[in-house]
Amino acid sequence: SLDSVQVTLYSHDPAVHNALVGAEGFDDTVAGIRNAVAAGLSVSVNTPLCSLNTDYAATVRFVHELGVRYVTCSGLIPSGSAEGAESQATRLTEEQLTDVLRRAVTVAEELGMEMDFTSPGWLKEETLRSMGLTLVPSCGACLSNMAIAPDGGVIPCQSWLSSQPLGNILTDDWDKIWQSQRCAAIRAKSAKMEQLCQLRQGNGEEASVC
């Protein structure tokens, strides 16, 4: 049975959230968080950080008021629509990202919340540990996580939207997908635990599109 759920909320500000997702979805997203908390599920809220939501600490306070006790955040991953010039212009530098995260960690500690930063290679290990964050992220593509797109396409991780899927869960045998050459190659790189995002670094045939 379902016991946990993660919801992406870009901002406590409806206008910012809606602008970043390209739809008027803020109210439905917040309602979903409330419903999941009320149902007794373990709820985490993830926020990809960019120049439009540098007040992330306020978003942490907002989701705490909704009953959320665990939050994660990440850099803006260059995949799908985030590869465009307009999106690239909103990406934070390492220094900016560190400042945003440090302020949010302070709020999370004040409220007794747990927080993790999940983008491998974006911030140095010593930077994360200096904030008291114990999770040093590594890429889990095809290793600890994969994702299924709405059309059934199987992708290495939830952000890997730029290249052809590894297969389709509706029409292809799972073992064939899992043991395919592409899947195995991505998994082998993830297993090195190099604290690098394969989408940022480029990985074999993916380098031309990621």
PLM regions with names:
Residues 3-4, 8-140, 145, 150-154, ...:
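Radical SAM enzyme [4Fe-4S]-AdoMet core and its adjacent flexible, acidic
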Residues 129-130, 136, 153-210:
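Flexible mid-to-C-terminal extensions adjoining Fe-S/redox cofactors in radical SAM and related proteins
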